[in-house]
Structures are given as structure tokens and as C-alpha cells.
Amino acid sequence: DTDGRYPVVYFHDGQNVFYSKEAYVGHSWKVIPAIKRNPDISRMIVVAIDNDGLQRMNEYSAWKYKESNIPGMQFGGKGVEYGEFVMDVVKPFIDQEYRTLADREHTAMIGSSLGGNITQFLGLEYQDQIGCLGVFSSANWLHQEAFDRYIERKNLYPDQRIYIYV
């Protein structure tokens, strides 16, 4: 199809999305076989954003973790910058270079574990641009109190679709 425009799904931990040999723990989400097994799924563009292995714990959290198992080490707190990269660099590039439906209604974000944490944060921070979230097994225990305070301050969009799997 050379004329169609498509919704976009952004996945965090992108190395885990397509192929098990590239996945962090040797097992991927197998997105391509899942799409092939379900021909009724609407066509979409899947953007799999790899993490920076050494910075994953920092970039996938907007807040510092309440405790660290390594004395003198603090993790987290770079999620705002990561979000700006995704929403101000990656998304505009994808929308410019590919035939996307760039509006909020056709933009989704998915992540699991720490990827779930950054998905829920970015989904709230950019509610005006992200219409659907898939949050799977988020690691909220790392900064639950900070996230709760954050939610309390946000005006939530009641029509944002959020799918949570714990």
C-alpha cells in the first residue's frame, strides 16, 4: 500500500520486541508472529526503541529510586530527558519519514517492567499526544510514592485508553 497512513505503536526496550536472539533475556515479545497470527489486527507501524543498556535504569525512571543496593550509587531520574528525546526527536522523525496517522488517537506506547514505568510516565506527561498505553508488569515499587504524587498533580484525560497487566 503506497497511499495509506497508519497508527504508530512505540515500544520501549525495543531489542525485546521482534527477535529472541536480540532480546535482553533471550525471549522476545514476538510481535511479528503475533501480528501474522491475528490477521484482523489493523495495520500499524511498530517503532521499537532499544534501551541504552548501561543507562536503562536511569532513563526509564523520571525519579531517583528510593533505595539502591549499591552503596553510594543512585539510579533513576533521567526519564524526563528520555521522554523529550522520544517525543521531540523520535516521534517527529517517524511522523515526517513514514506515512503515519500522527494524532493522539493513533499513537500508542507500550512497555514492561522499567519500560512500563516510563510508558506510564510519558503517557501522563504527553497525554495530548499519546492516546493509548500498554503498561505490563511495571516496576512501580522503585518509586511508588513519587509516581503517586505525580498522578495527583495531573489532570487526567478521561478518554486515554490504558491497558495494565500486573
Cite the ranges covered by each PLM segment.
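Non-catalytic cap/lid and distal C-terminal segments of serine-dependent acyl enzymes
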Residues: 1-166
